[in-house]
């Protein structure tokens, strides 16, 4: 799985960095958890404040386009983000913790 960054801009009003990216892969579309962990490595970000907002498959290609946000702190993230997006990303973190325990 390869990630290429399309745009990376700072949004001081909302206390976050906004990243648009493209993911290339060989098999099935990667999960949000896999993409999030790869973005943490590529962008050198804290996984607690990185939120993968969208991950959309490009029809007919082994690529997906995504949009992620990296907040300055957890308080800003919880204030701004919707519950559904936080739950989607939180579930992935809990699943990762279960795998680490085994």
UniProtKB/Swiss-Prot annotation:
Highest taxon, organism lineage: Archaea
Transmembrane residue ranges: none
Pfam families: Ribosomal_S24e
Gene it is expressed from: rps24e
Cellular component aspect of the GO annotation: ribonucleoprotein complex; ribosome
Protein name: Small ribosomal subunit protein eS24
A GO biological-process term: translation
MF annotations from Gene Ontology: structural constituent of ribosome
Keywords in alphabetical order: Ribonucleoprotein, Ribosomal protein
Organism: Methanococcus maripaludis (strain C5 / ATCC BAA-1333)
InterPro entries: Nucleotide-bd_a/b_plait_sf (IPR012677), Ribosomal_eS24 (IPR001976), Ribosomal_eS24_CS (IPR018098), Ribosomal_uL23/eL15/eS24_sf (IPR012678)
Entry's family note: Belongs to the eukaryotic ribosomal protein eS24 family.
């Amino acid at each position: 799985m390869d990630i290429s960054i399309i745009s990376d801009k700072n949004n001081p009003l909302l206390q976050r960095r906004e990243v648009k990216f493209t993911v290339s892969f060989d098999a099935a579309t990667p999960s949000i958890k896999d993409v999030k962990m790869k973005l943490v490595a590529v962008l050198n970000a804290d996984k607690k404040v990185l939120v993968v907002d969208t991950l959309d498959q490009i029809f007919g290609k082994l690529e997906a386009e995504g949009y992620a946000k990296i907040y300055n702190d957890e308080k800003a993230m919880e204030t701004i983000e919707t519950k559904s997006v936080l739950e989607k990303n939180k579930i992935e973190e809990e699943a990762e913790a279960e795998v680490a325990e085994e």
